[in-house]
Amino acid sequence: MDSRGFDSEGREFSSATEMWAHEIGAAADAPVSAAVAEPAPAPAAGSNGVAGEQEAGGGGKREEWYSKAIAYWQGVEASTEGVLGGYGCVNDVDVKGSDAFLRPLLAERFGAARRHLVALDCGSGIGRVTKNFLLRHFNEVDLVEPVSHFLEAAQENLTECMEVGEDTHKAANFYCVPLQDFTPDEGRYDVIWIQWCIGQLPDDDFISFFNRAKIGLKPNGFFVLKENIARNGFVLDKEDNSITRSDAYFKELFKKCGLYIHSIKDQSDLPKELFAVKMYALVTEKPKIQKNGKRRRPKNSPRMIRS
C-alpha cells in the first residue's frame, strides 16, 4: 500500500498517489510503503523553495503547484532568519552537523589526492550553506536557485567572502533555474548537495531530477540529501506547496532513482518542535559484497542518461 498522510489543513489522504492526483492532477509515481499519518510538527526550518521563477513544464495543476511555491518564497526576506523559516538559531548546529557528516566521506571517497573539488549547492537560497560550510571543503561551488532575490543576495554575500582572501575556494557559477528544469554539466561535480528544498518537487520530478543529475558527477562523486523527515507517511504544507516525506518514503524514491545509500546520519540538537532531519549520502552503484560478507564501496561510474 502507498504511504498515508495529510496536509496542513487537516485533509487526510489514503495514499501519496491520491494526494498527488489531487494536487497536480496526476499520479506522481508515489512509493509503496504503508504508514500511518502523524500529528503535524511546527513548520520546517527549511531554506528556499525549488520551484522556478520560470514556469515549470506541464499544465494546469502542476504549474499552479510550482507558481504557488515561488510566490511564497518571493515574499520571504533574503536573510538567514528568512530562509530558515524564523529559525535562524539552527544555522550553527546545522553547519556543524553537515561538516561532521561530510568530512569522513570526502576522506573515504577521494583520499589524500590533490584533487580540485567542485560542489553543486541545490536550492542554495542566499548562499548560507555555501558560505558557512561548502567553501571550507571545495575549491569551487556552483549555486542553483530559482528565486532571484535570494540568488542576488548569495552573489553579494559570497563576493564579500572572496574579498577577505578566500580566492582559492570560490563560488563559481550562479544559476537562476528551478531544479525540475536543471541539468548539470557532465562530469563537473564531486558532490551534489541538496538541502531543505527537494520537498518542493513532486515524486516524478524528484526522480527525473536525480536521473539527470547523475551525469554531473565525477568518478567516485556522490549526492548528499539533507531533509526534514516525517515520522510516517508524509505531511503536505499547503502554505508553500512542499511535502515532508518519511524515511521509508525517501528510500522507495531512491530505489526508483537507481541510487544506493552509502551512509545515513541524523542531525542532532534541533529544536524539539521541528521535524527530525536526516542526511543521506547516495551513490550510483550498489556496494559489492566481499567474501567476509561486508559490503565494499565501489567507485561511481556516472553514465549519460539517454532519452
From Swiss-Prot:
Does the keyword field hold Ligase? no
One Gene Ontology MF term: N-terminal protein N-methyltransferase activity
Q: Low complexity composition bias: which ranges? A: 38-54
Query: What are its GO cellular component terms?
Result: cytoplasm
Q: Give GO BP annotations, semicolon-separated.
A: methylation
Q: Which domain of life is it from?
A: Eukaryota
**Swiss-Prot/TrEMBL catalytic activity:** N-terminal L-alanyl-L-prolyl-L-lysyl-[protein] + 3 S-adenosyl-L-methionine = N-terminal N,N,N-trimethyl-L-alanyl-L-prolyl-L-lysyl-[protein] + 3 S-adenosyl-L-homocysteine + 3 H(+); N-terminal L-seryl-L-prolyl-L-lysyl-[protein] + 3 S-adenosyl-L-methionine = N-terminal N,N,N-trimethyl-L-seryl-L-prolyl-L-lysyl-[protein] + 3 S-adenosyl-L-homocysteine + 3 H(+); N-terminal L-prolyl-L-prolyl-L-lysyl-[protein] + 2 S-adenosyl-L-methionine = N-terminal N,N-dimethyl-L-prolyl-L-prolyl-L-lysyl-[protein] + 2 S-adenosyl-L-homocysteine + 2 H(+)
Q: Which UniProt keywords apply?
A: Methyltransferase, S-adenosyl-L-methionine, Transferase
Chain residues that bind S-adenosyl-L-methionine: 123, 128, 145-147, 179-180, 195
* EC number(s) stated in the UniProt entry for this protein: 2.1.1.244
Q: Where is this region: Disordered?
A: 38-60
Which Gene3D superfamilies does this UniProt record tie to the protein? Vaccinia Virus protein VP39
Question: Which family does the UniProt entry place this protein in?
Answer: Belongs to the methyltransferase superfamily. NTM1 family.
Describe the task this protein carries out: Alpha-N-methyltransferase that methylates the N-terminus of target proteins containing the N-terminal motif [Ala/Pro/Ser]-Pro-Lys when the initiator Met is cleaved. Specifically catalyzes mono-, di- or tri-methylation of exposed alpha-amino group of Ala or Ser residue in the [Ala/Ser]-Pro-Lys motif and mono- or di-methylation of Pro in the Pro-Pro-Lys motif.
Task: Identify this protein by name.
Answer: Alpha N-terminal protein methyltransferase 1
- What is the native source organism of this protein? Oryza sativa subsp. indica (Rice)
